[in-house]
């Protein structure tokens, strides 16, 4: 068995040393970008369409060796971990990927230009490891880099994308994590880091697709904040890093939470924000472990554990295999939870679920126990005199007429599943027109009945903030409803605002394919003529799967 190494002398070097290497290899501009935590609007832009490879329709779940072992990866470690996951309840709980990180390969390619596994670490080769992992019903992941060398200095995929993809497929690899070190920016004169990233990651996407093997694709470049993958990576990868490398302490976990929580608009089935691996059991307290797992699940983040699973300890396993919390992360609606409120280090997050329930996390960032509260209406619930709260960590149930509150320990989280009443699309938010990259907008924020809606640059104004409740889409805190003009049900009917009156022409269905249909007419909310200019009107039109009929809510 591979002995877990001391993080201070072994794997402990990984984030500090890897970041230092990245800084040196990316240059001063990227170094400055890494130091600053980005400030991101809660609804900054519509998500890019998902990759569409049929993979990761819920956030990937698995294990990666790097956080606990660094470069001390081996065939024995990977196979022992796979066997442990098979035996200890993790596989049954939904974990499926066993992922090898950096340092698995030899220091150079062979005479044919192929990557070669380090024979001392992987004497039987990667294909044999894949066969073993597959025999347990699990899947194997591997690591590479978009640059000329990996972050630890091993051969990168730059210029070898097609060759490496074919090799990975021939080995039976199911998941590729591709890093962002040693990028030859000189080959891309005049291009930004983001433009280079788009080019290189798209190359590997296409190479993987051409193999015919389903390989989930994970981009690891969010730590270079100038790349901002959440704005463009939906059609390129199944998940993308949004943050710097996580460390096994509360401060690091909190930083990654702060960066990732504001990116909910960019996540969805097949395309996920990744705030980095879980550090459960790697040094945080039991309370902090529970908080991290709650937050990652609420944010629909990949659940990739980075600890020692051969000897994990019962408390670590109890967190990692909490099926009620995992069910929130894996919910088929595919919504990332959003921040309802955040004041004085007391956070409330809400995540709508496919069956109409809402998951709520009350998170205490501070060093003292605090009472944190919200309401059913604030999390998108309505239409009931009572709601049932299920504590997802204790299993206890309670009822409330509307107030949701708990005493939350320092650095801790309380997580509820709220049932009852009707559920809208969660907290009020912008509605994005996917094809145009603009927002559903009431012109000049007027409140005049009969005003036709348009699309306009997203600015977070009152005429762009919509809430969903009881099948209605409302603006101005419920004062006006989205309305089909004069109860008409024909193509070209204008969509307007009107006083909410319970009419059938004010009932709307937000569909999983991104369309919004009028319940009365069966027609789709449509940007006229597939226009993209500010002021283009919105109408009803027969549904045709056009991008001008796709919207993202919340």
Language-model features: where?
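Secretory targeting and sorting signals
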Residues: 2-50
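Structural recognition of the beta-strand scaffold that forms the well-ordered cores
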Residues: 57-65, 94-101, 139-144, 174-179, ...
